[in-house]
Structures are given as structure tokens and as C-alpha cells.
Design a protein with these regions (language model features):
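Right-handed parallel beta-helix/beta-spiral solenoid domain characteristic of secreted/periplasmic
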Residues: 28-38, 52-54, 63, 70-137
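Extracellular beta-strand solenoid repeats
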Residues: 54, 65, 74, 83, ...
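The right-handed parallel beta-helix/beta-solenoid scaffold, focusing on the short coil/turn
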Residues: 30, 51, 62, 69-71, ...
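Extracellular beta-strand/beta-solenoid scaffold signature
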Residues: 88-119, 136-143, 159-168, 183-203, ...
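Leucine-rich solenoid repeat scaffolds
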Residues: 320-366
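Right-handed parallel beta-helix/beta-solenoid
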Residues: 2-5, 14-45
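Parallel beta-helix/beta-solenoid
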Residues: 48, 68-69, 77, 119, ...
Length: 366
């Protein structure tokens, strides 16, 4: 255990033991302790850049909005649980609900648990959310907008109405060691924006690594983004594991690396929506996107009868945008149906090389 970790634990223990709500840490920043029943938002509002708001073990009620750069919001592990305020609706609500009142009220009105909220003119940089559970929110467990260098680690996002963890208009994020389970849509959803039609955003190297994504409609959705990595994750029991999605807007989505993931038995059945066919048995799906690298993944036993079913699927875009110059190489695929590799896209330059597989549509891709 390193000295920083020892100092952090000692400070937390001292706060719990003495009953103090805030105390200076060894780094010169303040740790604000919040016990169940106390206001998390009040502690967040009083914190300065570099401070830590530490949530004690137990259940905390209500939504939290973070607008302070450099803030750390940390729990004490999965036993630190954030749930909606008593009486709050658990039905999914549309984006852009009531915006009046305090930031936390706005976050709650949108159906979110923790919001990291910046604006086009004033982003929120360097926020960390760690070591807690967010569950039961109508829309999203954690939602970030205009957040640069956001870190989300060791978070459990479970049974939220739409997304477990979601970002829009954000760059250089790190999502590591999280569990997203049984959320209504994607466990982890990264997009340029969901409200407007815009070209893909360069994320500056966002990393999604070593997460467990299970029982969601889609494990990870990458929508209209460029330049990020999805690596070392375990995805199982979803309707679809990974979606990399673009459309006709420019610049085109792409430059995503999906490598060294375990993608197994994503055979949950999800009905058709207004935007998408029914889903079942989809491993990695590329649609309307370019210059991606899909490599060294283990993709097994994903079985379904949807047009999007299969181990790795390059799918013809619903809006007619082709997928081009995608490299699918050195993956291990077994027991996927209707095939391990599926290409229904007329785009040029997509290559399939060095994959270990038995079946493909069309034939000859293995």
C-alpha cells in the first residue's frame, strides 16, 4: 500500500472517529465526510478544486451535481450506495426535463444520479468519481456533459432506467474497473451528443478498460466519436456487447480500437425500437464508421436471429452510410450464430485477417 493511500485511509478514519465533517488532508486539500442522511450536495457545493467528498458506507438519497473542476467524489466501496430521493419516479424520463432550481434538482429532474455538468464556455475538468454504487435512477446513474479528463473507476451502476454511465461532449475520459449491470439501454454510453445532429467528436484518447458489463441492452455504445480505446473488458449477458455507431454527419465516426475483450453469451433478447432492430446474440457491431481496429478479442457463443446477430458484424447503416477501412484481425471466435464474422456492408477497404473462426457470411472471411 503506498503512502498516499495510507494517508487517505488515515484521514478517513480520523474523520469517522472524531465526527468532523471536514479536515485537511496531507496534500493540502480538504476531505469532506458525508454520512447517510447528510447532504451530499451541500458538501459538493462547499468543496474547492482538488478536494475530496467522501461518502461513508451506507445509503445516500438524492441526486448530486458536480460543477467544480478537480473534485473527487468517492465512496467506501460498493456498500456506499446512492439512490433516488424517496418518492422520486423510477420511470425513464426524456433528456432535457425541468431545468429550474438548484443544479441537483435539475440533475434529479432529468432522472440522473450523479451529474458532472459543464458548459461549452466552461467545461468541468479533472473530476473523479470512484468506489460507490448508483442504482434505481430513472435515466442514468452517472451522466457527464462537457467534462474533460473525467475519471470513473470502481463504480457499480445497476438497474438504472436508460444508461449506467454516460457522457456527452466530453474528452480524455478514463472508465476503469466499473460494473454496469441490468441498465435499460447501455451499461456505458459515450456520445458526441444525443440532442443534435453533429459530426463525430475526437475524444483525445478516452479509455474504457477492465469493466464488467452485464445484463444491459448494449454493454458499451460508442456513438459518433473518434479516437478512443475499448480494451480488456468482460461483456456477457447483454443483448449486444459493443456497438460502434456513426451516421452521415461529418467528420465520420471511427478510429476506435476494440481489443483484448472477452465477449461471451450476449444472448439476452431485446425488442425492436424506433431506431434499431431487435437485438440478441451480437458481439461487436460496426455501422456507419471507419478506420477502426478490432483485434485480439475472444468472442464466444453469441447466438441470435436478429439482422445484427453474430460474433463481429459489419452492418449496413440504416441511413446508408458505409463502413470503410475497418481492420478485423487476430480475434478468436467460436460458437457464434448465425456466423462468427458477418459483413453486410458495401463499403470498401474492410479487411478480415488472421482470425480464428469457423463460419462467416459471406463465406471466405475466416
Amino acid at each position: 500500500m503506498n503512502k498516499c493511500h495510507i494517508a487517505y485511509l488515515a484521514c478517513a478514519a480520523a474523520l469517522l472517529g472524531t465526527g468532523l465533517g471536514a479536515a485537511p488532508s496531507t496534500a493540502g486539500h480538504t476531505v469532506h465526510l458525508v454520512r447517510p442522511g447528510e447532504s451530499v450536495q451541500k458538501a459538493v457545493d462547499s468543496a474547492r478544486p482538488g478536494d475530496t467528498v467522501l461518502l461513508a458506507h451506507g445509503t445516500h438519497h438524492g441526486s448530486v451535481d458536480v460543477t467544480t473542476p478537480g473534485l473527487t467524489l468517492r465512496g467506501m466501496g460498493r456498500g456506499t450506495v446512492l439512490v433516488p430521493e424517496a418518492g422520486a419516479s423510477t420511470a425513464a424520463v426524456p433528456t432535457g426535463g425541468a431545468g429550474a432550481g438548484r443544479a441537483a434538482d435539475s440533475c434529479a429532474a432529468a432522472g440522473n444520479g450523479i451529474c458532472v455538468t459543464g458548459t461549452k464556455d466552461r467545461g468541468v475538468d479533472g473530476v473523479t468519481i470512484a468506489s460507490l454504487t448508483v442504482t434505481g435512477f430513472a435515466k442514468t446513474g452517472i451522466h457527464a456533459n462537457e467534462a474533460d479528463r473525467l475519471t470513473v473507476r470502481n463504480v457499480t451502476a445497476v438497474r438504472n432506467g436508460v444508461w449506467g454511465i454516460a457522457t456527452e461532449r466530453s474528452a480524455r475520459g478514463v472508465f476503469r474497473g466499473n460494473t454496469a449491470r441490468d441498465n435499460g439501454d447501455a451499461g456505458l454510453f459515450l456520445a458526441n451528443t444525443v440532442k443534435e445532429e453533429e459530426g463525430a467528436t475526437d475524444t483525445g484518447g478516452t479509455v474504457v478498460a477492465h469493466n464488467r458489463l452485464e445484463g444491459n441492452r448494449i454493454g458499451v455504445t460508442i456513438r459518433r466519436l473518434r479516437n478512443l480505446t475499448v480494451a480488456g473488458n468482460h461483456l456477457t449477458g447483454n443483448c449486444a456487447a459493443v456497438f460502434v455507431v456513426g451516421d452521415e454527419n461529418k467528420p465520420k465516426a471511427g478510429l476506435v480500437t476494440v481489443r483484448e475483450n472477452r465477449i461471451e453469451r450476449n444472448n439476452k433478447s431485446c425488442p425492436k425500437t424506433a431506431r434499431l432492430d431487435a437485438l440478441q446474440g451480437s458481439g461487436i457491431v460496426l455501422t456507419g464508421t471507419e478506420d477502426n481496429l478490432i483485434t485480439q478479442n475472444v468472442i464466444r457463443d453469441n447466438v441470435g436471429t436478429s439482422p445484427l446477430s453474430g460474433g463481429i458484424v459489419v452492418f449496413k447503416s440504416f441511413v446508408g452510410t458505409t463502413s470503410e477501412r475497418n481492420r478485423i484481425s487476430d480475434n478468436l471466435l467460436q460458437g457464434n450464430s448465425p456466423a462468427d464474422l458477418v459483413n453486410t456492408d458495401p463499403g470498401v477497404g474492410n479487411t478480415f485477417q488472421g482470425n480464428s473462426c469457423l463460419s462467416s457470411r459471406p463465406a471466405g472471411l475466416c
